Every structure is written in C-alpha cells, then in structure tokens.
C-alpha cells in the first residue's frame, strides 16, 4: 500500500511538473507573440514614416511652382486694390453729389404713357 501511495505521489509530482512546463511554454509563447507584435508595429511605423516623408517631398515639389503663382496673384491683387482705392477717392465726392441730387431734386412730371380721358 505504501508503494501505491508512493507511486501516486510520483504521478502527482510528474503531473505538477508537466503543468509547470506547459505553463512556462505558454508564457514563452505569449512573450514571443508580444515581441513579434511589437516588432511588427515598429516596422509598420517606420514604413509609414518613410512613405509620409516621400509624400511630403513630392507634395513640396508639386506645390513649389504653385507657391510662386500664388505670390504673383497676390501682388497683382494688391496693385488692383490700390488702383481701385485711388479711383474711389477721386470720384467719391462727385458720386455723392449726383446721388443726393437725384434723391433730393424731385421734379413732378406726368408720365408720357398717361392718357387723359375727357
């Protein structure tokens, strides 16, 4: 009977060691998966940064010529605004006088299409 209990004890210890080994193997597997995932994320991030850098370079090359066009348009706009402001200052008083004359000087007249029936 003692040999049977000793055999059972050995089986229990063997089962315990096997469970520990399985547990360690699972932990190692999880660590490897986690490490692989982190490496993949780092590689993805590096690739994304590289592609973004290439895109920015192409975008800058494409927009470089457009930037000079926008400064030219801005310059022309400023010149035209200056001319319009000059015209405004020159003609403001005359336009106001004409407007006030039309509004204030009312001459009552009979419309040419009005017929007097009589």
Curated annotation (Swiss-Prot):
Keyword flag Acetylation: yes
UniProt keyword annotations, A-Z: Acetylation, Cell membrane, Hydrogen ion transport, Ion transport, Membrane, Transport
GO biological processes: cellular response to increased oxygen levels; intracellular iron ion homeostasis; regulation of macroautophagy; synaptic vesicle lumen acidification
Modified residues (N-acetylalanine): 2
Tissue specificity field: Kidney; localizes to early distal nephron, encompassing thick ascending limbs and distal convoluted tubules (at protein level). Ubiquitous.
Location in or out of the cell: Apical cell membrane
Disulfide partners: none
Pfam family, one: V-ATPase_G
GO cellular component, one term: extracellular exosome
Primary localization: membrane
Keyword Membrane on entry: yes
Subunit structure: V-ATPase is a heteromultimeric enzyme made up of two complexes: the ATP-hydrolytic V1 complex and the proton translocation V0 complex. The V1 complex consists of three catalytic AB heterodimers that form a heterohexamer, three peripheral stalks each consisting of EG heterodimers, one central rotor including subunits D and F, and the regulatory subunits C and H. The proton translocation complex V0 consists of the proton transport subunit a, a ring of proteolipid subunits c9c'', rotary subunit d, subunits e and f, and the accessory subunits ATP6AP1/Ac45 and ATP6AP2/PRR.
Known role: Subunit of the V1 complex of vacuolar(H+)-ATPase (V-ATPase), a multisubunit enzyme composed of a peripheral complex (V1) that hydrolyzes ATP and a membrane integral complex (V0) that translocates protons. V-ATPase is responsible for acidifying and maintaining the pH of intracellular compartments and in some cell types, is targeted to the plasma membrane, where it is responsible for acidifying the extracellular environment.
Assigned protein family: Belongs to the V-ATPase G subunit family.
Protein name, UniProt field: V-type proton ATPase subunit G 1
Gene it is expressed from: ATP6V1G1
